[in-house]
């Protein structure tokens, strides 16, 4: 099965892959951030949003993965094999979990549309040859003010209101009322 965990949120694994692996904070930092910002909503029995649900699932999945890694570490006799398993989990699974946690925390913090615009902006920036792109990559927290990505079908917002049309300078002609209609 080809399952993309970002599909229902308007993103793709490929879109997140444009961000380098060292872009994502450590799992510990992301878990601390999620706990500090969203602990009440994550622990609540109420459904808050699809991002909260996905974040809960990613946190639970990471916990189970750490339980498995501990079990393997304690039960695998060969140190070289143990090292291989730990490296695989940290490199591959760790990156996927860091991407998931970052995406859903960012969606909850900045809004899904802003995060998607950021991913597209970064993807365009990273694919542009260095000689032709700005020296600094887009920054998520400043994106709403500086984004150049526009949604299709909408005209850009104008900074000043458009001038109002002037009415004709000639006085309006009033219908003359007949004396009988004044009663």
Curated annotation (Swiss-Prot):
Membrane-crossing segments per the record: none
Q: Entry's InterPro entries?
A: Hepatitis_core (IPR002006), Viral_capsid_core_dom_sf_HBV (IPR036459)
Where is this protein found?
A: Virion; Host cytoplasm
Region of interest called 3 X 8 AA repeats of S-P-R-R-R-[PR]-S-Q, as start-end residue ranges on this chain: 155-177
On modification after translation, the UniProt record reads: Phosphorylated by host SRPK1, SRPK2, and maybe protein kinase C or GAPDH. Phosphorylation is critical for pregenomic RNA packaging. Protein kinase C phosphorylation is stimulated by HBx protein and may play a role in transport of the viral genome to the nucleus at the late step during the viral replication cycle.
* Motif, Bipartite nuclear localization signal: chain positions: 158-175
Residue ranges with Basic residues bias: 149-176
- The UniProt entry annotates sequence repeats at 155-161, 162-169, 170-177
**Record-level GO cellular component terms:** host cell; host cell cytoplasm; T=4 icosahedral viral capsid
Listed A to Z, the keywords are: Capsid protein, Cytoplasmic inwards viral transport, DNA-binding, Host cytoplasm, Host-virus interaction, Microtubular inwards viral transport, Phosphoprotein, Repeat, RNA-binding, T=4 icosahedral capsid protein, Viral penetration into host nucleus, Virion, Virus entry into host cell
GO BP field:
microtubule-dependent intracellular transport of viral material towards nucleus; symbiont entry into host cell; viral penetration into host nucleus
User: What's one GO MF term for it?
Assistant: structural molecule activity
Q: Where is this region: RNA binding?
A: 177-183
Using the UniProt annotation, give all residue ranges assigned to the region (Disordered): 136-183
Phosphoserine modifications at:
155, 162, 170
The record describes its quaternary structure and partners as: Homodimerizes, then multimerizes. Interacts with cytosol exposed regions of viral L glycoprotein present in the reticulum-to-Golgi compartment. Interacts with human FLNB. Phosphorylated form interacts with host importin alpha; this interaction depends on the exposure of the NLS, which itself depends upon genome maturation and/or phosphorylation of the capsid protein. Interacts with host NUP153.
What biological function has been recorded for the protein in this entry? Self assembles to form an icosahedral capsid. Most capsids appear to be large particles with an icosahedral symmetry of T=4 and consist of 240 copies of capsid protein, though a fraction forms smaller T=3 particles consisting of 180 capsid proteins. Entering capsids are transported along microtubules to the nucleus. Phosphorylation of the capsid is thought to induce exposure of nuclear localization signal in the C-terminal portion of the capsid protein that allows binding to the nuclear pore complex via the importin (karyopherin-) alpha and beta.
Q: Which family does it belong to?
A: Belongs to the orthohepadnavirus core antigen family.
The protein, known as: Capsid protein
């Amino acid at each position: 099965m080809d399952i993309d965990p970002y599909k229902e949120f308007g993103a793709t694994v490929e879109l997140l892959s444009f961000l380098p692996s060292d872009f994502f904070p450590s799992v510990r930092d992301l878990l601390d951030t999620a706990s500090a910002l969203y602990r009440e909503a994550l622990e609540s029995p109420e459904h808050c949003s699809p991002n909260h649900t996905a974040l809960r699932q990613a946190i639970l999945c990471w916990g189970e993965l750490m339980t498995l890694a501990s079990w393997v570490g304690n039960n695998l006799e060969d140190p070289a094999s143990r090292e291989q398993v730990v490296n695989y989990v940290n490199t591959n699974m760790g990156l996927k979990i860091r991407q998931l946690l970052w995406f859903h925390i960012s969606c909850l913090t900045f809004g899904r549309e802003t995060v998607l615009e950021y991913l597209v902006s970064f993807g365009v920036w990273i694919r542009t040859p260095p000689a032709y792109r700005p020296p600094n990559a887009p920054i998520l927290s400043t994106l709403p003010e500086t984004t150049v990505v526009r949604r299709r079908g909408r005209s850009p917002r104008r900074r000043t209101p458009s001038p109002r049309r002037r009415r004709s300078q000639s006085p309006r002609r009033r219908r003359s009322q007949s004396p009988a209609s004044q009663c």
